[in-house]
Amino acid sequence: IATLAIYTAPLQLKYDGRIGGRLDADLVLPMIKLYERTNTRCEAGWAATQEILLRRADKTLFESDEVIRLLVEHSGGHPRELLHLLRLCCELAPGNSIDHATAQAAIGRLAADYRRWLTPEDYALLCEIDRTPEHGGNDERAQRLLHRLALMEYNDGSWRRSHPVIRTLEGYVRAAAQ
């Protein structure tokens, strides 16, 4: 039987030395770039990310275009995070539509997942990388943040930025103020 199989695995496995050489060629899908390194909006990335969202949920499900924009923005351009936010919205919505309050609650819930494991040192490094995106950070801490999606990589790794939901957390705000 001729078949084509696609396996997906967490990004951490790609960098795990214990399985090196045991897998066939791998393909790591990039984040969809919502912003350029200069922080100008990348319209093509926004359109692509919004299209992913609207292929999963009808536009009439959302109270407004602003709710769609909010979810796209806080996904950081990562399709899995976008769909995670959509799932949280569906779980949290009090009725049959997703309003601004529901989207904010979903963002807060996703942010809480990160807050549980991020340390003050992690926040400081994320702020440093956000101030200087080409800094990148290739030490063990930066690699851990990258593997756990607290740090997002764009343009084949040429620059990085913290996950947008992390920027809503008090720990990040405190570190950014220092």
Report the location of each language-model feature.
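C-terminal alpha-helical "lid" subdomain
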Residues: 59-74, 79-178
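The catalytic "switch" region of P-loop NTPases
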Residues: 1-68
